Curated annotation (Swiss-Prot):
Its main location: cytoplasm. Residues 144-213 form a coiled coil. It is a peripheral membrane protein. It comes from Saccharomyces cerevisiae (strain YJM789). Disulfide bonds: none annotated. Residues 380-428, 434-453 are annotated as: Disordered. Residues 384-395, 408-422 have a biased composition (Polar residues). Required for cytoplasm to vacuole transport (Cvt) vesicle formation and efficient autophagy. Plays a role in ATG protein retrieval from the pre-autophagosomal structure (PAS) and is especially required for autophagy-dependent cycling of ATG9. Also plays a role in regulation of filamentous growth. Forms a complex with ATG9 and ATG27. This is Autophagy-related protein 23.
Length: 453
């Protein structure tokens, strides 16, 4: 049975016991209800036995309170371990976080001299000499509107054959050099493009590996979150920091370039939840430890109450048995008032001694009820013994009514100490035990009142 159920049963028994105390007083003072006294006494005894069993169940070596405290201590240790693992994972995840692209090279980055490529433009030397030889205005660079035929006619008139051949050779050399340099640049460009393609493929591959590592970390974070949710349910904790999405949903939606504020917000929420959960567990442990101490003290008190009540019952039962025996052995079924008063006074004195040793309201009330009815009987006996009547002296009405309700062996069996049924086994009633819901429900007082009346 769970701790809360046991505590609930204990409260029900206490409520029912309080009702029985009132019924006990009423039954003792009402002649018409005298037949119910034995049943009510048994119910009170059963309730006290049940309270003793419940307290034993709570405070024993492996009692419910100690088990609950042990469970909470394990929950606290689990929470601390989960938080430690979670913080390590968040720290590791941060180390895998890719910052936004930057143009700045690392501080330890050194350029390899062999990687420096010099681009030449030798064709420009030949080309410049050609332009100087013929003149820029006599080339297609000129903005003149003259036709090519007119330019060619002027050049032919001003240049000799050797000059023209030399200019032609300069153009050939420049052309050859330009083609050679273009080929070199195109080759270099192809190499650059090939390198760039390789870089892009490697970026994808490395990005995938980084995502895989982060995904693995996120997976473990989600598992920790599931464990923390289960722990929250066990300790009855509801986070005041509600989120639109669960941590798992948010965590798997993170990108490599996720905003730092999401990361920081998640860490803040986790840390606050951890602090709240830890505080709640510690408060529960403290409360249960106080309960344990309180119940240990109550166990001693309830045991004392039960023993006093059993002593009271035994003494009253012995008195009733003696009176019944004397009534049977008497020739006219009568007992002299003085003799009866002595027997009752002896019991009253014993009950007074019990009251002196008790400072608990429950047993004080119950024993006082039993003593008071005996005192009243003594007063009636004393009154009758001092007032002569015709014929034989009449016995007091109340004691006679109580005792005559027990006949033969039934009277003796009713005065025996009732055996206590198994704990929480309501089906073994009558009498009903203190934890029966049918007895301690909202209508229990009416039902029991009808029983007495």
């Amino acid at each position: 049975m769970e701790l809360n159920q046991v505590l609930e049963k204990k409260e029900q028994i206490l409520q029912y016991l309080g009702t029985l105390v009132g019924l006990h007083e009423k039954a003792l003072s009402d002649v018409n209800s005298a037949s119910q006294v034995t049943s009510i006494r048994k119910d009170i005894t059963i309730c006290l036995n049940d309270l003793c069993r419940i307290n034993d169940l709570l405070v024993s070596h492996d009692g419910l309170l100690k088990r609950e405290i042990g469970s909470l201590l394990r929950d606290k240790q689990e929470l601390l371990e989960l938080n430690e693992r979670e913080q390590l994972l968040w720290k590791e995840r941060k180390s895998w976080h890719i910052e936004q692209e930057t143009d700045a090279a690392p501080a330890d980055y050194v350029i390899d001299k062999d990687a420096i490529i010099t681009i030449s433009s030798h064709h420009r030397t030949s080309l410049n000499k050609y332009i100087e030889s013929v003149g820029a205005e006599n080339t297609i660079l000129s903005n003149t509107d003259d036709s090519d035929a007119m330019i060619e006619e002027v050049q032919n008139a001003e240049s000799s054959a050797d000059q023209m051949i030399r200019n032609y050779k300069l153009l050939q050399l420049s052309h050859k050099q330009a083609k050679s340099e273009i080929i070199r640049l195109e080759t270099l460009l192809r190499d650059f493009k090939k390198d760039n393609k390789f870089i892009e493929e490697e970026l994808k591959r490395q990005s995938g590996r980084i995502r895989s590592e982060m995904g693995n970390i996120d997976f473990h974070l989600s598992k920790i979150e599931e464990s923390k949710h289960q722990l929250m349910k066990r300790i009855g904790f509801e986070s005041p920091l509600t989120q639109e999405k669960s941590l798992s949903e948010k965590i798997f939606n993170l990108r490599l370039s996720s905003a730092d504020e999401d990361y920081n917000e998640r860490q803040t929420i986790n840390m606050k939840n951890f602090v709240h959960m830890k505080d709640l567990i510690e408060l529960k442990i403290e409360d249960l430890q106080e309960q344990l101490t309180r119940n240990k003290n109550e166990s001693s008190t309830v045991l004392t109450q039960r023993e006093l009540w059993l002593d009271c019952q035994k003494k009253v039962g012995d008195l009733e048995s003696k009176l019944i025996t004397k009534l049977r052995s008497s020739s006219n079924s009568k007992i002299p008032p003085n003799e009866m008063s002595e027997m009752i006074n002896s019991t009253i004195q014993y009950l007074n001694n019990l009251l002196d040793s008790s400072d608990e309201k429950l047993t004080t009330t119950l024993i006082s009820n039993e003593r008071d009815v005996l005192s009243k009987a003594c007063e009636e006996l004393h009154s009758e013994s001092t007032t002569p009547q015709d014929g034989s002296s009449a016995l007091p009405s109340k004691p006679i009514d109580i005792h005559k309700s027990h006949k033969g062996s039934n009277a003796s069996s009713n005065l025996k100490q009732p055996s206590t049924p198994s704990f929480l086994v309501a089906s073994k009633s009558p009498p009903k035990i203190g934890i029966s819901e049918s007895v301690v429900n909202a209508n229990k007082n009416d039902a029991i009142s009808k029983k007495v009346e």
